Amino acid sequence: MNDINPAFVMPDVQSSRDTRQIPIQRVGVKGVRYPVSLKTPAGVVPSVGTFNLDVHLPAEVKGTHMSRFVALLEEERAPLELASFRVLLDKMLEKLEAEAGRIEVTFPYFISKIAPVSGVESLMDYEVTLTGEIRNGVTRVFLKALVPVTSLCPCSKKISQYGAHNQRSHITMNVELAGELPVEALVRMAEEEASCELWGLLKRPDEKFVTERAYENPKFVEDLVRDIAMRLNADERIVAYVLEAENFESIHNHSAYAVIERDKRLEPTA
């Protein structure tokens, strides 16, 4: 018999007291795939986000209300941008009756690009992550982008009579924001400092351009992170960052890798 007596009040087990007196820094749901709308320069476009949502749980409370995380995503369907993301973060803390919490959402982001010679247009996809957290009343927002580029080895070019080994590389920038920073602007910082950027569609004249451009602009993995770091350092919208470059070496079965981390609040003159 599944009938429920209207007079019966179901117990709220999660809100009961816990006697172990151990707080939990982060508890919530992970890997929730949900439709999102992205606010872009081209307008509002549909996408799919993978969400991780969690809150702080006080020592005296037994559990959090897991269903409320998903209910939040269903209720708050505004197009995703930095302003609406901050609102989503505030709403989560209100809904979960929490003092601290964190939201992370990863989604594919498409940018229309024009080939350098033929002018054909195509889409390039980038993996983008927005992370927001509230701790001790302070809100912090991070924008992360994984940007695929081409790198060409300066040493290989120098020692060879002709040619040089080159490969696809991944530039990952996770920046803490002090102001509005479009995804496109962050992506361009990486692409403009690579040996050459990538396009989704190229014709033969474009392939010639890309090959020669990379050859004329060789960079070690160390060069990549240093040159991009100079761009991040100069941008006042960015207060801190973790910058990674990984070259998938075409002549080895391993990658070359470099990382630069900086918090401008701790190193204001660096």
From Swiss-Prot:
Domain of life: Bacteria
Pathway: Cofactor biosynthesis; 7,8-dihydroneopterin triphosphate biosynthesis; 7,8-dihydroneopterin triphosphate from GTP: step 1/1
Reactions it catalyzes: GTP + H2O = 7,8-dihydroneopterin 3'-triphosphate + formate + H(+)
Gene Ontology molecular function, alphabetical: GTP cyclohydrolase I activity
The protein's role, per its UniProt record: Converts GTP to 7,8-dihydroneopterin triphosphate.
Keywords: Hydrolase
EC number: 3.5.4.16
GO biological process: tetrahydrofolate biosynthetic process
Gene label: folE2
Site features described as May be catalytically important, chain residue numbers: 153
Protein name: GTP cyclohydrolase FolE2
Family: Belongs to the GTP cyclohydrolase IV family.
